[in-house]
Amino acid sequence: MKIWNKIPIKDNGDKLIAIPSCLKLLDPHPYFHLGAPYEDKTSIWKLREEVINRLVKVNDYLISKSSFNLLIYDSWRPLEVQEFMFKRAFLLECEKSDIDISFENIKSYPSILKKVEKFWAYPSNDNWCPPPHSTGGALDVCLSDKDGNLIEMGSMVDQMDETSNPYFYANIKNEEAIIWNSRRNLLREIMTKFGFAQHPNEWWHFSLSLIHI
């Protein structure tokens, strides 16, 4: 059991609302583009109201301190979308290993399941241990230029390997690594300044919580 599953959950009643136009969104949405089962395009970009309030402050502060903008890569995920993406990640990992398997036999390959769960929360419908993105309190963010173009951070969002660790480039001293590490540090420092916690395995994933969810 992951440590956050031991923490009692209490819904604070914060509304799930559309993300305002003052925040930059990745277009097209990466999972909708893959066929993830969102109800419609209006249901893609949503977060809890307090999360949005703090993101606006993050973006304003980021712009005042750098040449970057905050770019939201992904936000709230309906459970059906979480299931779609989890299955896709698992089956792609099986394909890389030349394993022909149906998702129903997922437990037959615990090493692959363990790797996937390091980056993708299992699509549990248990209200006491929901996937973080399905609560509306977690999101994936990047840095962009003023036109919304992604800034290189040293790995792609959702890249399931060690380069996605927030501190992977901290002790690598070539020119590119130093730049990527400084950008990751900037993103983390500003997000945490406004109350967000960073996922220990993903430089892009943050949640408004006292723990990493």
Where are these regions (language model features)?
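Extracytoplasmic cell-surface/polysaccharide-interacting catalytic and binding patches
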Residues: 1-75, 79-200
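Conserved small/polar residues in nucleotide/adenosyl-binding loops
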Residues: 211-213
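Conserved metal-phosphate-binding beta-hairpin within the catalytic cores
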Residues: 206
